[in-house]
Design a protein with these regions (language model features):
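Glycine-rich acetyl-CoA-binding "A-motif" of GNAT/NAT acetyltransferases
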Residues: 20-23, 95
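C-terminal "cap" of GNAT-fold acetyltransferases
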Residues: 112-126
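Conserved active-site alpha-helix within GNAT-family acetyltransferase domains
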Residues: 91-109
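A short, internal acetyl-CoA/4′-phosphopantetheine-binding micro-motif in the GNAT/acyltransferase core
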Residues: 51-62, 89-90
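Conserved acyl-donor/pantetheine-binding loop and adjacent beta-alpha core of acyl/acetyltransferases
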Residues: 24-53
């Protein structure tokens, strides 16, 4: 659960405008468990961060907030020595998929998870 993710070093960023939560993003350290999902050889899965749930307030859609959060997410991962980032996106979620691609991620596969079908995106950080 959430506490378990925080206990292993996960973080949640929530951005506000005044008292209104505008957007949020979650970092989950991937670890060796991600090997089964990603199936990419030759990378250190302990140096990979997973983009967890992302939220953008409906009233703030279309302002580039997700893309800005993804950039900050990458900066954070680089600052703690991580080399890779991955995430999963529902195939019907065109907006998130476009933001992942805009942020330099590539769709590497598609799998069925507990929450249903997901596209898997991955990139190596600079």
């Amino acid at each position: 659960g959430l506490q378990g993710m925080l206990d292993i070093g996960g973080k949640i960023w929530i951005y506000y405008e005044g008292d209104i939560p505008v957007c949020s993003i979650m970092f989950i350290p991937s670890g060796e468990d991600a090997k089964n999902d990603l199936e990419i050889e030759g990378i250190d899965y302990n140096l990979m961060g997973d983009i967890g749930p992302v939220f953008v307030n409906f009233d703030y859609l279309g302002h580039g907030l997700m893309y800005q959060m993804l950039q900050k997410f990458d900066e954070y991962l680089e600052s703690i020595g991580y080399k890779y980032v991955m995430t999963t996106v529902h195939p019907d979620n065109i907006f998130s998929s476009r933001n992942m691609v805009k942020n330099g991620m590539k769709k590497v596969s598609q799998k069925v998870f507990k929450r249903g079908l997901r596209d898997i995106y991955f990139k190596e950080l600079d």
